[in-house]
Amino acid sequence: VSTYGSLLKTRGVGRIITAQLVARFPGGMLSLAFLMHVERIHESYGAAGLVLAATSIGQAVAGPLTSRWMGVWGMRPVLILTSAVCTVAVVAVALGDASTSVPVFMALGLLAGLANPPVQPAVRTIYPKMVNSKQLTPLFSLDASAQEIIWVLGPVIATFLAIQVDTSAGILVAAAFLVGGGAWFISSPELGRVRIPRSKRRFGVVLGRPPVLLSTIVGFLLIAACSAIEAGVVAVYGHGGPEAGFVLAIFAVGSLIGGLALGHIPISPWAMARRMTIILVGTALAAVWMQFAWLSVFLFLAGVGIAPALAVLFAVVSSSVRFSDTAEAYGWVGTGQLIGAALGSAAAGFVIDAQGAQGAFVVAAALLAAGAAIAAAFHRHSPDLRGRDAGPMPDTEPVAIVT
């Protein structure tokens, strides 16, 4: 606790964490909000899954590219442009009704994905410039816990609004977060103080670094599993009561507690696999016992591993690339997670249509098993950060010597 207390006393840390959290909050709401909105209109989880797939394609194309643009044109211009376009597309989805065809919803989802603001790569690049080397790993842990508010509490809010108001309400609230949170983050002084150097490497080269690729793949599988779990919980209880929101809130609490409790533990090469295994065990048990009480207990257990696993991913990437490549590297990792959020919901939707709600938990367990196995098989590509600085490697270049 004292570690996090001193960290939050560091100038600007609390403000930038909160601002980026609000700006990124739509990422946790929109997948499930789109799923419920399109499913209600067209009465098909499959149709909703197609819209989410289109959104994920847009995110896949744009994520690393817009992150790299920040090193060329600066963070603020890129964030302003993408936030504006994304907001327009998201509001258009919310205004869609029975006369709006699935292909039109898909086109709007694609545009929203293409314009997804690169807030995560921006803030991950700023962090090492705000704190000393000893504070960086706890900062990643604190940030990972905050991110779980996005991924887990976001769907709770989307579900509550869909039940109490209308499925479009969750989408419109997400648009409000896009505007308000985006403006707050963009106005942060740190965005003016930190300049991302232009990378000297070709686009995509950083993804070829084994630690970055490993973190991208495992992050994709982890968030896909979380989205499948969320869709499964909604399918179990439907839109007619508060139970789904309660279960997802318990899932969120588990993640927050896990992130804060385990965030100080040094990161070893096996840390990623171990933390993925915690989530796998909880999810597998939830797939067997789906009564309200047992589902809550087992998803709490699964949640305990989520934020710690994400903290490992962030630290592995930060310690494995040069500063000029950090934005693009985090762009790839963030894209993997966003695609996972969309495709996890989409896959779960198709399975729910075919086999019922339990199928979504089976899908999630399979994704987590794959993630844990990959993390274990390639643990040598996860650096040993016990007693080591988790900050990025400095950029170096030849220096002219006057003789």
Residue ranges and their predicted role:
Residues 2-60, 206-251:
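Helix-loop boundary and gating motifs at the non-cytosolic
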Residues 21, 102-118, 220, 295-308:
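Hydrophobic core of transmembrane alpha-helices in multi-pass small-molecule transporters
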Residues 34, 117-131, 308-321:
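Intracellular juxtamembrane helix-capping segments at the cytosolic ends
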Residues 61-75, 162, 257-271, 352:
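Helix-to-loop junctions at the C-terminal end of transmembrane segments
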Residues 84-99, 279-291:
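C-terminal ends and interior cores of transmembrane alpha-helices
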Residues 108-149:
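Cytoplasmic helix-loop-helix junction between adjacent transmembrane helices
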Residues 271-312:
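C-terminal transmembrane helical hairpin of 12-TM major facilitator-type secondary transporters
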Residues 325-357:
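A late C-terminal transmembrane helix in Major Facilitator Superfamily
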